[in-house]
């Protein structure tokens, strides 16, 4: 195949074709193990047939930023391991989106997403123990090392506090945030069978 930067060029063409004049941030196009590197921007490897491809990109339109992350199989067909990870992340994202409403505390969305990801990793055998103990120990951190989202608006990571007077901020009408959980299993993640390696 195609190089990651060639896929970036196709995406950039579509953005420009539809009126976007600039990216909201440097696009991330990661295939295979590169999909497991947060904020990977080299975009210079060949995409292999059995890789998962992660695109994290956004356009800027009328001064407002967007931020979209999607993962798909390069060959168009999920393997069993690909599908298992994809479905856990999708379930976490959908639950997080459902929780975004006025009155919900910022960290409540993180808790919902983390619970679903942790349970999913238990279900597929990558974590062992009880759900509550694993959440308390933050056992999913080697696989999911960031929060569920951030403010977005005139900037991709828009200004705004997550806490006020040391209390988690509650969402209000007009606030905009992302919900973008993920699972990243690099080849050097300890104790993980090889069939799960390089999934992100």
Predicted regions, residues:
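Active-site neighborhoods and metal-handling regions in enzymes and metal-associated proteins
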Residues: 1-200
